[in-house]
């Protein structure tokens, strides 16, 4: 099957280091491993190209406008040009990562027999309005309704995201399918024998709660150290906080996705200290980092928010969000108990293998399309 993968979000380079880029690459890998021919159409290619995707055809159409209103119009125009290119080249399936103002999937599926899958990872209209600049909200809503209305399936990474889609686009055929993890790229490894290392992987933004991890480390009663794998706008503040607390934190900075396993090597615990963002529907994420910890055979300590209690049931340790003292207690307990770390790590790896491999995630999506249409995708 010929698959046209579309990502018109200029904040998501195909070959980038952030979690969204990892998501794009892993879905493409899973499609290719299933025997499908994939062509990617995107507004940003990126330059961190992994060896196994070096032959991937990526058609880039950059967004150049900086003025918010012009930028929105340009994104809409690019989506129309991409749809034209896809129709000219032919396709069997359009798999589009939901982006503001794009109507590419709708345009293609209205004009040819190709099926469409819309993947929604976040309530982008709300995010753009609250955290950035949204000039033409009506156009953004119209585009979402067109896309979800034409998609054979709208895949949502969490129940709150699915509810958001169903509220704004009532005709959407929506299904919750959480994120996955590469079971080949990320595998278990031995702990560093010189000490317990607690690892965080992710972009350094306020809603990831890394400052609570720093404060927990300052409260620790057992010996353990912190390793932060990632970059972001909070890096200067986190470095200053670590210095002020007298912590020797191992900041690794941004790393390409294929190098994350090497930076996790030697860690003994993985942590996801999310704060309380104000209600269940605000905790709409499906965190890749937690699945990577599970695949790496790390015991996980995470805030009891969003999907994490379900994901970590029986295989992880949950703590109240925004509580460095409770976070420190949980990490202290694991730091002092290597047998419990080994037990939880083995259970976590098994959970990742049974439920969360990317091949399983993509197969779930394609199977649902086939069931709805009675056609083998």
Where in the sequence are the language-model features?
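Membrane-proximal helix-turn-helix segments that form the acceptor-binding/catalytic region
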Residues: 84, 107, 124, 135-154
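Carbohydrate-associated surface elements
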Residues: 160, 180
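Conserved donor-binding/catalytic core segment of Leloir-type glycosyltransferases
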Residues: 4-6, 155, 190-221, 227
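A short, well-ordered alpha-helix in the C-terminal region of glycosyltransferases
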Residues: 333, 340-354
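Conserved acidic donor-binding segment of nucleotide-sugar-dependent glycosyltransferases
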Residues: 201, 314-325, 333-339
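Acidic donor-binding loop of glycosyltransferase active sites
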Residues: 152, 264-283, 298
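Nucleotide-activated donor-binding/catalytic signature segment of Leloir-type glycosyltransferases, i.e.
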Residues: 236-264, 269
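N-terminal subdomain of nucleotide-sugar transferases
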Residues: 1-48, 52-54, 153, 215-218
């Amino acid at each position: 099957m010929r698959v046209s993968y579309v990502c018109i979000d200029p904040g998501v380079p195909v070959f980038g280091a952030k979690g969204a880029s990892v998501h794009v690459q892993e879905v493409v890998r899973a499609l290719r491993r299933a025997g499908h021919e994939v062509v990617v159409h995107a507004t940003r290619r990126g330059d961190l190209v992994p060896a196994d995707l070096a032959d991937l055809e990526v058609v880039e159409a950059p967004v150049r406008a900086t003025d918010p209103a012009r930028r929105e119009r340009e994104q809409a125009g690019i989506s129309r040009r991409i749809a034209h290119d896809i129709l000219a080249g032919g396709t069997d399936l359009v798999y589009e990562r939901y982006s503001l103002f794009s109507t590419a999937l709708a345009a293609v599926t209205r004009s040819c027999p190709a099926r469409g899958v819309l993947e929604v990872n976040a309530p982008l209209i709300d995010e753009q309005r609250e955290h950035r600049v949204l000039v033409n909200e009506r156009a953004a809503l119209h585009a979402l309704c067109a896309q979800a209305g034409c998609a054979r399936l709208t895949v949502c990474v969490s129940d709150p995201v699915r509810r958001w889609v169903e509220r704004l686009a009532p005709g959407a055929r929506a299904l919750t399918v959480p994120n996955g993890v590469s079971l080949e790229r990320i595998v278990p490894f031995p702990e560093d024998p010189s000490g317990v290392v607690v690892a965080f992987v992710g972009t350094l933004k306020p809603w990831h709660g890394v400052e609570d991890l720093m404060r927990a480390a300052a409260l620790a009663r057992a010996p353990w150290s912190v390793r932060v794998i990632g970059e972001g706008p909070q890096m200067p503040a986190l470095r200053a906080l670590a210095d002020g607390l007298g912590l020797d934190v191992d900041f690794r900075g941004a790393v390409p996705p294929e190098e994350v396993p090497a930076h996790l090597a030697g860690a003994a615990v993985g942590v996801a200290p999310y704060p309380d963002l104000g209600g269940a529907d605000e905790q709409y994420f499906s965190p890749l980092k937690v699945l990577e910890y599970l695949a790496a055979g790390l015991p996980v300590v995470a805030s009891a928010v969003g999907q994490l209690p379900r994901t970590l049931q029986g295989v992880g340790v949950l703590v109240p969000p925004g509580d460095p003292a409770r976070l420190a207690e949980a990490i202290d307990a694991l730091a002092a108990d290597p047998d419990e770390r080994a037990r939880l790590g083995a259970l976590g790896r098994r959970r990742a293998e049974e439920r969360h491999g990317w091949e399983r995630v993509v197969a779930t999506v394609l199977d649902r399309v086939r069931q709805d249409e009675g056609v083998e995708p």
